[in-house]
């Protein structure tokens, strides 16, 4: 697991329960699911919001977990 990645919320759709985070280091955009938002105790994510997160690989699918507001 890669930890403490800095990024910015590209978009998050609360109706569809997912979105994407743009990595500050220029890497690929990272999928974020509502369950990670809920686990972080956040009400939601806003476009352009700065976040810190870890990358989790589940069966070859990368997603953001352990979200923190920067």
Swiss-Prot record:
Compartments where found: Cytoplasm
Family matches, as InterPro entries: Cold_shock_CspA, CSD, CSD_CS, CSP_DNA-bd, NA-bd_OB-fold
Entry-linked CDD domains: CSP_CDS
Keywords per UniProt: Activator, Cytoplasm, DNA-binding, Transcription, Transcription regulation
Positions of the CSD domain: 7-67
MF term (GO), any: DNA binding
Protein name from the UniProt record: Cold shock-like protein CspA
């Amino acid at each position: 697991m890669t930890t403490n990645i800095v990024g910015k919320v590209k978009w998050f759709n609360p109706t569809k329960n997912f979105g994407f985070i743009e990595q500050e280091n220029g890497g690929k955009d990272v999928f974020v699911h509502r369950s990670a938002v809920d686990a972080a105790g956040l009400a939601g994510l806003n476009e352009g919001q700065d976040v810190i997160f870890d990358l989790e690989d589940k069966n070859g699918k990368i997603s953001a977990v352990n979200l923190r507001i920067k």
